Amino acid sequence: MSRYTGPKWRISRRLGVSLSGTGKELSRRAYAPGDHGAGRRAKISEYGMQLREKQKLRFTYGLTERQFKALFNKAGKIRKGTHGTNFMISLEQRLDSVVYRLGLATTRQQARQLVNHGHILVDGKRVDIPSYSVQPGQVVSVREKSKNILPIQAAIESVVARPQFVSLDTEKLEGSLVRLPEREELDADINEALIVEYYNHLG
């Protein structure tokens, strides 16, 4: 299944989550798209709730279903902690997610593009794979020739606060995943237990 490239605002309103991270999609019309979006929503089934929760998280991180499920299955092999929480943490360890959390990009999509285009280094070596799993202590930096490109500079200037599990030297544009995030530091609007139930239901 290919990555969704359609209108993000429409998907945001349908799922009730801001895919851009700005919240603008929901500020005007917080209901689902369509002629009857503002009306009373039909009650959805338990399976429907599980599917919607899975789609919310998948679209938030911009992954294909294949990428999403592969990481979900990998997280299930981690012995410590719960499957759902480990999955959420694994999503945050993706290089594009770390670049986004460091404030080197304003959206995860932009962070993915920076990685794809070779602007990002890990421990001094170029890594152009967005799904690369960053480990605590690894140094994530911007390539010297890329430090002055406008999107990165604009992103740095727009940062209000960074999560405590990452750290960035704004002069060197060099940072790291200080530690793995705690569940309470991640998206509170996601019920990962429903996602686990969804995949368990599929078998």
From Swiss-Prot:
Gene Ontology terms describing biological process: ribosomal small subunit biogenesis; translation
Domain S4 RNA-binding: 93-153
Alphabetically ordered keywords of this record: Ribonucleoprotein, Ribosomal protein, RNA-binding, rRNA-binding
GO molecular function, one term: rRNA binding
One Gene Ontology term, aspect cellular component: small ribosomal subunit
Top-level taxon of origin: Bacteria
Free-text function comment from the UniProt entry: One of the primary rRNA binding proteins, it binds directly to 16S rRNA where it nucleates assembly of the body of the 30S subunit.
NCBIfam families: PRK05327.1, rpsD_bact
Quaternary state and interactors: Part of the 30S ribosomal subunit. Contacts protein S5. The interaction surface between S4 and S5 is involved in control of translational fidelity.
PANTHER family attached to this UniProt entry: 30S 40S RIBOSOMAL PROTEIN, SMALL RIBOSOMAL SUBUNIT PROTEIN US4M
Family to which this protein belongs: Belongs to the universal ribosomal protein uS4 family.
Protein name: Small ribosomal subunit protein uS4
Species for this entry: Leuconostoc mesenteroides subsp. mesenteroides (strain ATCC 8293 / DSM 20343 / BCRC 11652 / CCM 1803 / JCM 6124 / NCDO 523 / NBRC 100496 / NCIMB 8023 / NCTC 12954 / NRRL B-1118 / 37Y)
